Amino acid sequence: MSGGAGIPEVPGIDASGLRLGIVASTWHSRICDALLAGARKVAADSGIDGPTVVRVLGAIEIPVVVQELARHHDAVVALGVVIRGDTPHFDYVCNSVTQGLTRIALDTSTPVGNGVLTTNTEKQALDRAGLPTSAEDKGAQAAAAALTTALTLLNLRSRI
């Protein structure tokens, strides 16, 4: 299966009025800066002029900041990259971050778009970073996922 197979089109989203938080790590800055640019573009295209953006050092710091933003925002996007090395550290970090983000979304009923890349190589991360040479833009996809889910929840809550 080729990379990016099955990716849905990012829909036109009218999220004006929603409060969006974005947490992006600074480790692997070229990749994380590109992910952040993709998320910001989706936010702007969706009618959100000023998302709250917080930078943290690494991926392991992302969940606690996402948790705080989830208390005051309609949706949050988590952006970072973890590249496999020669030790089990990769597995611990990836599992902790993924489980933390899922728990936060469920505990707060706030959508969390997971744009934390977990790859075997830097090339794989670059290919998903939304750069001009990338096949995918996981930052944009994570923002679109968080915003569309927030709109879905608002719609459901208005009918309950």
UniProtKB/Swiss-Prot annotation:
Pathway: Cofactor biosynthesis; riboflavin biosynthesis; riboflavin from 2-hydroxy-3-oxobutyl phosphate and 5-amino-6-(D-ribitylamino)uracil: step 1/2. Its EC number is 2.5.1.78. It is an enzyme of class 2 (transferase). GO terms for biological process: riboflavin biosynthetic process. It comes from the Bacteria. One of its GO terms (molecular function) is 6,7-dimethyl-8-ribityllumazine synthase activity. CDD domains: Lumazine_synthase-I. The keyword Transferase applies. 5-amino-6-(D-ribitylamino)uracil binds at residues 27, 59-61, 81-83, 114. GO terms for cellular component: cytosol; riboflavin synthase complex. The keyword Hydrolase does not apply. Keywords: Riboflavin biosynthesis, Transferase. The active site is at residue 89. (2S)-2-hydroxy-3-oxobutyl phosphate binds at residues 86-87, 128. It catalyses: (2S)-2-hydroxy-3-oxobutyl phosphate + 5-amino-6-(D-ribitylamino)uracil = 6,7-dimethyl-8-(1-D-ribityl)lumazine + phosphate + 2 H2O + H(+). Catalyzes the formation of 6,7-dimethyl-8-ribityllumazine by condensation of 5-amino-6-(D-ribitylamino)uracil with 3,4-dihydroxy-2-butanone 4-phosphate. This is the penultimate step in the biosynthesis of riboflavin. Homopentamer. Belongs to the DMRL synthase family. This is 6,7-dimethyl-8-ribityllumazine synthase. It comes from Mycobacterium leprae (strain Br4923). The lineage of its organism: Bacteria, Bacillati, Actinomycetota, Actinomycetes, Mycobacteriales. The gene is ribH.
